[in-house]
Amino acid sequence: MKIIHTAIEFAPVIKAGGLGDALYGLAKALAANHTTEVVIPLYPKLFTLPKEQDLCSIQKLSYFFAGEQEATAFSYFYEGIKVTLFKLDTQPELFENAETIYTSDDAFRFCAFSAAAASYIQKEGANIVHLHDWHTGLVAGLLKQQPCSQLQKIVLTLHNFGYRGYTTREILEASSLNEFYISQYQLFRDPQTCVLLKGALYCSDFVTTVSPTYAKEILEDYSDYEIHDAITARQHHLRGILNGIDTTIWGPETDPNLAKNYTKELFETPSIFFEAKAENKKALYERLGLSLEHSPCVCIISRIAEQKGPHFMKQAILHALENAYTLIIIGTCYGNQLHEEFANLQESLANSPNVRILLTYSDVLARQIFAAADMICIPSMFEPCGLTQMIGMRYGTVPLVRATGGLADTVANGINGFSFFNPHDFYEFRNMLLEAVTTYRTNHDKWQHIVRACLNFSSDLETAANKYLEIYKQ
């Protein structure tokens, strides 16, 4: 089976969030048994094109967007995946000067890229074309209007239903879409506005989200009734498939950044397992200037953005100070106000023996925190899937989550973690923290059962890939 993914992010090359990681994991798992290709735009200022001798092909092609255009497709293989980078030769201003993945004119830029990608797919042929989020939503309409050879199915995955690609009808008219297919993207209440996600929903054969609970939640999203109508119309061709993590990348067995490597097999003698965690904790506390007297260790490894529940993060700081356990927060702030608030907290708590706030993300330090911490807190307002809770469980670190989206699908309260429900209830959140800390301190048998359940949780990529294959073959 030949599968082509179109997206804006792909973690080995460029990423801004979980989409790039999820696509990489899925493509890697599919490539084990199927011809798998990922098509993304080339950002010359953000990553370097592979050397010519490492490329497997260089193709010139034409596409239509705001007139006849020319592009070059550079292809190479990475871990069995064919990666194709598009350079828009006659529209260089769209990507060549971009210093970030996302800018203010994304709808126009991504539609131009989508037009080039669709032209390439029509030329190359594919059995499955798999789109990721609204960014390449135009591809669905273009391929429905003019299918490629051997095309069996167009699949759309919603990594974040909150982002939809609102744009103008004028931009859709710049493509080769005819009036019928433009109408699939058009808003009835405002015919001059088109929504790339809306058209992609109608023009795709199957729609997936990145967790079963998130699939249910988006059917109850009434923030735009026309988008709600579109997703409701597709509900019989909608399925939530939980993302997996690459256990060859994330795991304490071989992680070179740890003070002490360990395996889940050590848990046959729990004391040995916890001794390994303790060695990592000691090394981390020394690095961060924390006191080992404060236990357990709770961490938050997250972007600090409204989606991630920053109001709960502040409550966690107060709770840690009141209850004498360690809290480590690491992540980048999004938004000036949040940055100012957390920078002030960082400064005021710089000499605290049990709280550290680190506002510059480091992959190495994050891995050391995963291994050292006893718990990871993820109080998200919404979470389509979430990967950090699964990574935490791989390291024997118990997740404390708000029961939403993929967090609800992966964490069972009192079984392999702790959870709360109300997105605005500090009392419920603090009770969850207290229950987790008290269990750790006073009920060692229950704590061991919870950690064992974490270590036995299945989060491999192959499970997710097999579920996508079921959809491809339907």
From Swiss-Prot:
GO molecular function: alpha-1,4-glucan glucosyltransferase (ADP-glucose donor) activity; alpha-1,4-glucan glucosyltransferase (UDP-glucose donor) activity
Pfam families per the UniProt record, alphabetical: Glyco_transf_5, Glycos_transf_1
A biological process term (GO) from this entry: glycogen biosynthetic process
Pathway: Glycan biosynthesis; glycogen biosynthesis
Chemical reaction(s) catalysed: [(1->4)-alpha-D-glucosyl](n) + ADP-alpha-D-glucose = [(1->4)-alpha-D-glucosyl](n+1) + ADP + H(+)
InterPro entries on file: Glyco_trans_1 (IPR001296), GS/SS (IPR011835), Starch_synth_cat_dom (IPR013534)
Protein family (similarity comment): Belongs to the glycosyltransferase 1 family. Bacterial/plant glycogen synthase subfamily.
Protein name: Glycogen synthase
GN (gene name): glgA
